[in-house]
Amino acid sequence: MASMIRSEIHIPDHEVLRKIGGGAYGEVWMARGVTGALRAVKVVWREDFEDERGFEREFEGILKFEPISRDHPGLVNILHVGRGNDSENPFYYYVMELGDDVHSSREFNPVEYQARTLRSDLKASEGVPLDVGFCIDVGQRLAESLQYLHEKDLA
């Protein structure tokens, strides 16, 4: 029953197109905004937490992160945060820019889009180790982003 309800998510001013990812605390959906721009929408469900306190703590964290998300080049820009209006299955959501497409970093095809990740880069390398310089660059950018979050009391 929960998966049927979850497939009918309503995000204001967005047409939810398809699920593109997920993890322990939520699902990521592709959606089209009223301007036509494709976005990623992370939906975090209350039922995925042991208690209300943990759910609300995570919501407070994203509220704190949203205004600073645009202040550092290593962070994903949060464009909007909101709460779902389903009292039986409470959730909150946040709208983000889509990450690079594994097939093309410029044009997003809503049917074929697949997020580019370190895993997809490793798979594309077909067993050839990733360039050391690339790995150092990624590691440095991650460390700088994490340091910034620590400075803002978010990590």
For each feature predicted by the language model, list its residue ranges.
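Conserved N-lobe loop of protein kinases adjacent to the ATP-binding glycine-rich P-loop
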Residues: 31-39
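AlphaC helix of the protein kinase catalytic domain
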Residues: 104-130
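Activation segment signature within eukaryotic-like protein kinase domains
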Residues: 138-139
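Short pocket-lining segment of the protein kinase catalytic domain that shapes the ATP-binding cleft
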Residues: 94-101, 110-111
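Short beta-strand micro-motifs within the conserved protein kinase catalytic domain, predominantly
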Residues: 77-92, 100
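Conserved N-lobe ATP-binding subsite of Hanks-type protein kinase domains
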Residues: 27
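Protein kinase catalytic-loop region centered on the HRD/HxD motif
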Residues: 142-155
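AlphaC helix of the eukaryotic protein kinase fold
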Residues: 45-69
